[in-house]
Amino acid sequence: MYVLSETKSNFLKLIAEALKRRGLEVEEEELERLAGRPPSPEMGDLGVSLFRYAKKLGLRPEELTSELKGEIEGRLAGVKEVKAIGGFLNVELEPSWLAERALREASREDYGKWSFSGRLVVEHTSANPVHPLHVGHARNMFLGDSLVRILKNWGADVQSRFYINDMGRQVAVLVYGLLKLGRLEPPEGEKPDHWYGKVYSVANALVELNSPSKGDDEKKEWEEVLKELESKWPEIVREMKEKFDDEDPEAKVSELMKKYEEGDPEVKETFRKVVNEVLKGFKETMERVGVNVDKWDWESDLVWSGEVDKIINMAKEKGLVIEKDGALVMVFKNLNDEVRRRLRIPKGLQIPPLVLKRSDGTTLYTTRDIAYTIKKFEEFRADRVINVIAAEQRLPQIQLRLALWELGFKEYAENLIHYAYEMVNVPGMKMSGRRGRMITLDWLLDEAERRVRELVEGRSEAEDVDEVVKKVAVGAVKFAMVSVSPEKPITFKWEEVLNFERNSAPYLQYTYARAVGILRKGGEPDLERADYSKAEKYKDMILSIAEFPEVARKAAEDLKPDLIATYLLSLADKFNEFYHKEPVAKEPDEGLRNLKLALVKAVANTIRRGLWLLGVEAPARM
């Protein structure tokens, strides 16, 4: 166990034992929630709030902490002093003892790794295969990839999956548009997902415009949309308009959906060919940002295998299905307070019945998602399944958990996590799917590279400037997406994302390169010759280094990559202050020089490890 984790665990055990002797049974986990680093060094290095226990025992807070201080003193390795400060019981660690252990730990390649044993599935990205990945998908992908890394670092066995939604209306609209154009393949030299995105936008506008169910006002709006699309892609619009001769294109789209769901060989071949081409574009972008997925799951395979029909039949057998206007609807019969609590459903939130099958016999996304969730749990024998899905999908995700519960898959329902995230806004740019206005991830990366190149060209020490530009650009975009808590929206501002002086990936990458540069000049530290007796001056930074494993563990337990981002920025600030004040390579005192070099190496390794958990590469030269 790591030095700070071990010290905290031993400290909390002694407190729990002392409280037990007074008749209070307190779990170590409960005490851990009340533990933390005191606000000032004078108060100690680790503390626990005991106010609530003093109240339960009918004691004044300072009375309880004073008693416990006497019982704990002399029983903890590495502790210089136990301090009772009001209702807080704190410990101050011996600097030389802490430094020797923490700096040795932090020099290891796998620093911050744990050995939790669990099996987890993380489904992320899962974009509709009809257009390129955009900024919203980017946040999804980078959060998902970071969760995979953080959970693996925790020691879990993790599988990442991408759900290919090939049975939705959007893919059918794209295929319909392509059939009208008379060609399925993208033009030579154009990235496939980008071309298909154009075709989809035009086809969707024409389907809506020519739909008999649309009123005059709606048609006027779609005419405006089509004009805007024509100004961007005149050839596609003109060519498709000429061939758009169906009286009711919406009915034709529905017919394509139905035929695909039924497994019509010709339609099946067409859909699969188109979707695979779009996925090629996705994979190219994902490779560019270093994101891999273990398993690609086709929605259609679930239907053709009969798994979705099994779900519908099971619901019928349990008396959960009613027929409404020809559609099959699942009603939730057991939505009581206990179920709401166990499935994390807010009190008072109305949950409508779930349509399983339309009147035309086709199934809906959430119906298929029930079968897919069971598949994810059973194929991987997962303890938990985490779905990284936008916050706006909150209701369908609640319906999914409820459906699993009603069908008897109670354990799956409780262990299915909707990892919700909010929108990404880029000032001065508006996204509109219907107007084909998309801030694509490809564009964002190109623009990041262009801006980074302007900043580093002529000033970079690296031999391969192109490689540095790519790493910094990708890292900057990734960090911007994962460093903000997922429940908060992001405003993506270039001046913040590419700030080399604070609060960004380039700042952390630059700090890492600076630390590695010092080690190039000063050499590797000799940990046996380091003078740990002089560690007092650097204790704050040593404590921060020692906190990394705990931060990595908490990020895994709470599913919060932003905790790592916040921690790294704080550590980098402390290191840069140290860098400006302290000579390292030129330090004449050998013992002190080795101590400082050990500090620099520990910071470099910690930043490298932390950035890796966020999916960001750390170049050795900038």
Swiss-Prot record:
Reactions catalysed: tRNA(Arg) + L-arginine + ATP = L-arginyl-tRNA(Arg) + AMP + diphosphate
Lineage top rank: taxon: Archaea
SUPFAM superfamilies, sorted: Anticodon-binding domain of a subclass of class I aminoacyl-tRNA synthetases, Arginyl-tRNA synthetase (ArgRS), N-terminal 'additional' domain, Nucleotidylyl transferase
Biological process annotations from GO: arginyl-tRNA aminoacylation
Subcellular location: Cytoplasm
Matches recorded under Pfam families: Arg_tRNA_synt_N, DALR_1, tRNA-synt_1d
GO CC field: cytoplasm
Catalytic activity, EC: 6.1.1.19
GO molecular function, one term: ATP binding
NCBIfam families: argS, PRK01611.3-3
Name the record gives this protein: Arginine--tRNA ligase
Organism: Ignicoccus hospitalis (strain KIN4/I / DSM 18386 / JCM 14125)
Name of the gene this protein is made from: argS
